[in-house]
Amino acid sequence: MIPFLDLKPAADAADVHAAINRVIARGWFVLGPELETFETEFAAACQAPHAVGVGTGTDALALALRGLGVGPGDEVITAPLSAAYSALAIMMIGARPVFADIDPDRLTLDAAAAAAAVTSRTKAIMPVHLYGQPADMPAIMAVADRHNLLVVEDCCQAHLATCAGRPVGSFGAAAAYSFYPTKNLGALGDGGAITTGDANLAAHLKRLRNGGQTDRYHHAEFGVNSRLDEIQAAVLRARLRWLPRWTSERRALSAEYRRRLKGAPVTVPAEHDPGHVYHLFPILSPERAALQAHLKARGVETLIHYPVPITRQPALAPERPADCPVADRICADVLSLPLHPGLTRQAVEEVAAALDAFHAPA
């Protein structure tokens, strides 16, 4: 069996265990030195002046928007192809997600579609760097600048990615990251962070994540309880040192998939930027259900990211669904192949051979 993912600590196991034991021995579990140091180290890795650790990637998105003044009555333009949490984050602060279709090659927010979705109520654009593929940030920033809009980048699947030679997260006013265990930089539970170049925003976010407190038991504003705990921060510090190596592995394995699948009757989304970090490796097939069943029978585990566009989710798009035909088509055809650090080239060859067998003449 070739698993889709393997989340057990492997090469990093000794570092992870040492990090956990260090926190337990210290006896300080929330808002302590591990978080403070991780924030400094993660900011440096992202080439950002400031990082603020929070409880989840969803909270990171919601707090970034809220910290920038987005709230009830405002509209935020985002992509319909994503995990639903991107839209949930907008709704959590009382704003309204407005969906603009995706670029059929990048599979990320299309700048022209975003421009067409701007109204007098639009306050921000939230592009999602999906699957590790950077959105077209120069084009999106041009739309934002033309309409005087904020930009918050959803980098939850794009740790260390770059676009046009710049780190993702460096284009907008703030960026949100997730450390959910499946992410390129994953914790042993939930976690998230916000990066920004604005010192005042960073200080504000640190208050918001801790109940709006300016001092212990002194709540100056309405905040939330969303803190990246010390054990997760310590684990992330340990794994951050492995992230460049893991990113190189993902890129090498993806290049092998691309080489091996060249000419196969499936569509492999284009790599528009060498800064792609391959959180996932999706392919497109109009025969997805049959292909997935065939791969399962051959011992290859696959998943679908994502089977339903956010515009078709009743809880998240209660009004008339936006017209996003590209996202609809991608959701009908997309299938994610196994990809993770530790996956071997032999496994990639076996996956490709299984794909060949599906398409071989009877």
Which stretches of residues belong to each language-model region?
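N-terminal "arm"/small-domain region of PLP-dependent enzymes with the aminotransferase-like
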Residues: M1-W28, P33, P338
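Phosphate-binding glycine-rich loop
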Residues: W28-E75, S86-I93, F99-D101, R166
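PLP-dependent aminotransferase class I/II
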Residues: L35-E41, A45-A51, A112, A124-V128, ...
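Structural detector of well-ordered beta-strand residues that form the stable sheet scaffold
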Residues: V52, I77, V98, V151-V152, ...
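Conserved SAM-binding loop
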Residues: G53, T78, F99, I194, ...
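PLP-dependent aminotransferase-like
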Residues: R66-C155, T162
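Hydrophobic/aromatic ligand-binding patch that stacks against planar heteroaromatic rings
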Residues: A89-I90, V143, P167, N184, ...
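Conserved active-site segment immediately N-terminal to the catalytic lysine
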Residues: E153-L188, D215-A220
